């Protein structure tokens, strides 16, 4: 049984072309697994490493999934796939329904394991994309196959949007006094390594796994202070009132009744408010508070090193849909 657990696996990879997806593909290859990546038709795959198989697939279409998988058998699915915007229709189509299609197909092709990259914010669901993710999590838990649900805190790239502002001598933007929220940020590479180890580490099977990076939890103000220190500039902060979100949400929600496209705009504002007011740490439901000490740490990469590389121009701002600012 132990030798079977340690043997290389045939893995179907979803979300392979995003930053965390690419890192996860690299980690899977380092661990000796054979990786087949399902990507959207027309998606450039040049960024994927040699040694992977790439198949074009519309993940919202069960027939397209069937054609992409062909007659192959495989052992596991690893998914870093997520909706791009968090808009309700996109979230339910990708975070829930597309994953269900993949799960059904995977079981039919011999898969006995599914590793899902979720998000720590689903523990306090207020948004449609969180509800969609939770709905699939429940389906996965009830599926009968071995599962691991990984809920990371903020990624480095998610909290790197103000590096250029600081370099340009502009103030660092805070919500309130900058202490409303905290997180244990984690790098793509460390999170990817954690995902890959879930395939073989039985202690991570059939468990929901919150995970943060190394070091202490940091508030938004502490992130700004770190960035100013590394840039060699005196700290300058500007406070943005959270009530701004409430005004925008109320206005867009009202107008959305008669102008449907504004409903998504209202949801985007709700997403912004959520991240401005909720910490990315484990939620202690009994105490009704976030608990940094209960949020596990993993990896070696630090936010300070990430900021240094960005300040030196060694890393680009690659936030995409992960942008907080």
Regions found by a protein language model. Name each.
Residues 178-199, 207, 219:
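Substrate-positioning beta->alpha
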Residues 243-325:
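A hydrophobic C-terminal alpha-helical subdomain
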Residues 43-108, 121-123:
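NAD(P)H-binding glycine-rich loop region in Rossmannoid oxidoreductase-like domains
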Residues 175-181, 207-217, 231-232, 240-242, ...:
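Glycine-rich Rossmann NAD(P)(H)-binding loop
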Residues 20, 191, 195, 211, ...:
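Non-catalytic, hydrophobic alpha-helical segments
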Residues 158-165, 198-209, 233-235:
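Glycine/proline-rich active-site loop of Rossmann-fold NAD(P)-dependent oxidoreductases
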Residues 8-33:
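N-terminal Rossmann NAD(P)H-binding glycine-rich loop of SDR-like oxidoreductase domains
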């Amino acid at each position: 049984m132990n030798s079977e657990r340690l043997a290389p696996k045939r893995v179907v990879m979803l979300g392979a072309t995003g930053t965390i997806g690419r890192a996860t593909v690299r980690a899977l290859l380092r661990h000796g697994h054979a990786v087949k990546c399902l990507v959207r038709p027309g998606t450039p795959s040049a960024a994927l490493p040699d040694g992977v198989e790439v198949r074009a697939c519309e993940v919202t279409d069960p027939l397209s999934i069937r054609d992409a998988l062909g007659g192959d058998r495989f052992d596991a699915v690893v998914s870093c796939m997520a909706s791009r915007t968090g808009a309700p229709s996109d979230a339910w189509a990708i975070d829930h329904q597309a994953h269900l299609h993949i799960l059904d197909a995977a079981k039919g092709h011999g898969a006995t394991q599914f590793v899902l990259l979720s998000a720590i914010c689903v523990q306090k669901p207020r948004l449609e994309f969180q509800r969609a993710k939770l709905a699939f999590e429940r389906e996965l838990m009830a599926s009968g196959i071995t599962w691991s649900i990984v809920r990371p805190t903020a990624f480095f790239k998610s909290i790197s949007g103000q590096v250029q502002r600081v370099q340009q001598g502009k103030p660092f933007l805070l919500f309130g006094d900058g202490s409303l929220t905290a997180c244990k940020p984690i790098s793509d590479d460390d999170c990817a390594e954690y995902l890959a180890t879930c395939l073989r580490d039985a202690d991570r099977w059939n468990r929901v796994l919150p995970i943060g990076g190394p070091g202490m939890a940091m508030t938004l103000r502490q992130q700004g202070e770190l960035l100013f220190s590394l840039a060699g500039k005196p700290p300058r902060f500007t406070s943005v009132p959270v009530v701004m979100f409430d005004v925008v949400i109320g206005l867009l929600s009202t107008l959305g009744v008669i102008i449907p496209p504004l409903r998504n705009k209202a949801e985007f504002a709700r997403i912004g408010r959520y991240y401005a007011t909720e910490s990315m740490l484990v939620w202690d439901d009994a105490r009704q508070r976030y608990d940094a000490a209960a949020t596990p740490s993993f990896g070696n990469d630090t936010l300070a090193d990430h900021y240094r590389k960005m300040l030196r121009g060694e890393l680009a701002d690659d936030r995409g849909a992960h942008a907080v600012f």
